[in-house]
Regions:
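Active-site cofactor/substrate anionic-group-binding motifs, chiefly glycine-
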Residues: 60-85
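N-terminal small/glycine-rich loop or linker at the start of catalytic domains
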Residues: 40-67, 133-155
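Alpha-helix-loop-beta-strand connector modules within alpha/beta enzyme cores
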Residues: 103-134
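Glycine-rich, proline-tolerant flexible connector loops at the mouths of alpha/beta enzymes
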Residues: 59-67, 89-114, 141
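Acidic, His- and aromatic-enriched active-site or binding-groove loops in soluble protein domains
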Residues: 113-120, 153-166
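Short, Lys/Arg-enriched N-terminal segments with co-localized hydrophobic residues
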Residues: 1-11
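Short, well-ordered coil/turn segments that N-cap beta-strands
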Residues: 42-45, 86-88, 126-130
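N-terminal amphipathic alpha-helix/helix-capping segment at the start of soluble metabolic enzymes
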Residues: 12-57
Length: 166
């Protein structure tokens, strides 16, 4: 069977006219699958999940139609669907309350911040059925929105790294 498929692919791509008419290789779904260079499936995806404080919350994100922020208690449903579809990993992004932001991004070091609670919830409910990715960054936690500490509008790289490594 594999030899037959290889022969078909070879003739369809390397043959001379009239055998080499590439639209023939795209005419039917089965032939497109045979000659495709790559394929994309749920197992190739990472699901971004945007988190918000509170209980039983699902909030739309105006700038991204059909995308939502979820409270940690809603993760069971969201992550459960991802696991059933075969998505191997989620990426968590917090929407930090303005009251918890400061110029140093201190909330990033809180072991009970939104992302840490999300990680604990997913690990407890799903064990190793799905991977968890997080952005090691300060921008969700700083009052100025930059990904590093600022001094006179300049990022302080070394000082920022000190915080990020904690």
């Amino acid at each position: 069977y594999n030899t037959f498929v290889a022969l078909i692919k070879y003739n369809m791509i390397t043959g001379k006219y009239p055998s080499l008419r590439l639209r023939r290789s795209r005419k039917y779904a089965w032939s497109r699958r045979l000659v495709q260079e790559s394929s994309l499936s749920y197992s190739d995806l990472i699901l971004p999940i945007f988190l918000i404080e509170g209980k039983n919350k699902k909030e739309s994100i105006k700038s991204m139609p059909n995308i939502f922020r979820y409270s940690v208690d809603k993760l069971n449903s969201v992550v459960g669907k991802a696991v059933k579809k075969g998505i191997p990993m989620v990426a968590l992004f917090p929407h930090t309350n303005t009251k918890k932001k400061d110029e140093y991004g201190s909330e990033a070091l809180n072991p009970n911040n939104l992302v840490c609670r999300g990680i604990k919830f997913i690990k407890k409910k799903f064990k190793n059925k799905i991977g968890i990715m997080c952005d090691v960054a300060l921008d969700p936690y700083t009052s100025h929105g930059h990904d590093g500490l600022l001094k006179k509008r300049n990022i302080l790289n070394d000082e920022t790294l000190e915080i990020l490594t904690k």
